[in-house]
Amino acid sequence: MEIFKLINQELQRQQDQIELIASENYVSEAVLRATGSVLTNKYAEGTPNKRYYGGCEYVDQIELIAIEKLKKLFGARHANVQPHSGSTANAAAYLALLQPHDKVLAMGLNDGGHLTHGSKVNFSGKIYDFYHYNVDPNTYLLDYDEILKKAIEVKPKLIVCGASNYSRAIDFAKFRQIADHVSAYLMADIAHIAGLIVAGYHQNPVEYCDIITSTTHKTLRGPRGGIILTNREDLIKKIDSAVFPGELGGPLMHVIAAKAIAFDEALQPKFKTYIKNVIDNSKAFCEAFINKGYQIIANGTDNHLFSINLFKKFNLTGDLVENWLYQANIVVNKNMIPYDSNKSMNPSGIRLGTAAMTSRGLVQSDFVQIADWIDQIIKAKGDLNVINKVKSEVKKLLVKYPIYQDRDY
């Protein structure tokens, strides 16, 4: 069938290309097995032991295992594993805490925030009244004093911290102080850094934030999905009711099973080693660009990602460089940078991440080599001879790091 042919072609693409998109990763064979299991046949509207359908005795056990493992990972009192994505987790969190047109303060999209943090084209910006804080225009770092001033001015009901493109550590304790000062709820969207948090390489928001949302892929290395956490007893029912029946009908039980497996994998000692390698690789990768004279947003990284300003020094846009690199089998994504004068489809930057290729086994020296390849292509302004030379070297490198060797669709 044509679909299976295309899946095999996608498998080959993943094998042959260097994946530097910060929101992508490679799941384990066990996670793949669960995602493609017979659990996809089962409708299980409701929550464990409170379903609206019969025949749920096994999926009840699966969901309860997922919940308990997730609570253990974060040290949280309560967890909901049903959201289909990070966006639906955020939507449910807002539904639990807010009324339409309530004020919310979140990170600006260009500064590193997410569409669901109040973009005017997103449901969040249409239903709620979002205001935004920005990074410092010189350092591109969060300025907590300025965020406090903005919070006092806006008087939001909810403050959202967390980002989709911020390379430095986030101080949840400081955000808690700001939220308390204006009597606001505090929500952390940790979609990108969840893996770092559970491995102990980033401050845990659970003790500081009223509600925490995340994806289960990215650095957590699970299936595509979302989660919600809280330590507040008075919010548990509101959160669960916001997910079902407020937002979702039937949960995806095959994905919840895959989440449970990924959570168990993240509880193992080798996951902490993996995350340390992700961060070490990211720092080495970033430093290689700094040594070549590139402008790195926030002048470095504390996590799995960083962004490069291509426009200031090279007068290049992210879409152009993304295309050049893709021709050489290097996959990145174009990205807006703080205070960007360009539009979203031809922004000034690219974003790079190390989580996926670290999963494949690449080490710091490999990332230094990749930085050199990217530098060659950028400085040659996409010359095809340079692109083809790099592409052949990329293929030689990746032969040493195969993925899903026994898979065939």
From Swiss-Prot:
It is found in: Cytoplasm. The modification N6-(pyridoxal phosphate)lysine is found at residue 218. GO terms for biological process: glycine biosynthetic process from serine; tetrahydrofolate interconversion. (6S)-5,6,7,8-tetrahydrofolate binds at residues 109, 113-115. Pathway: One-carbon metabolism; tetrahydrofolate interconversion; Amino-acid biosynthesis; glycine biosynthesis; glycine from L-serine: step 1/1. The record marks 217 as: Plays an important role in substrate specificity. It catalyses: (6R)-5,10-methylene-5,6,7,8-tetrahydrofolate + glycine + H2O = (6S)-5,6,7,8-tetrahydrofolate + L-serine. SUPFAM superfamilies: PLP-dependent transferases. Its cofactor is pyridoxal 5'-phosphate. Homodimer. Belongs to the SHMT family. Catalyzes the reversible interconversion of serine and glycine with tetrahydrofolate (THF) serving as the one-carbon carrier. This reaction serves as the major source of one-carbon groups required for the biosynthesis of purines, thymidylate, methionine, and other important biomolecules. Also exhibits THF-independent aldolase activity toward beta-hydroxyamino acids, producing glycine and aldehydes, via a retro-aldol mechanism. HAMAP family: SHMT. NCBIfam families: PRK00011.1. This is Serine hydroxymethyltransferase. The gene is glyA.
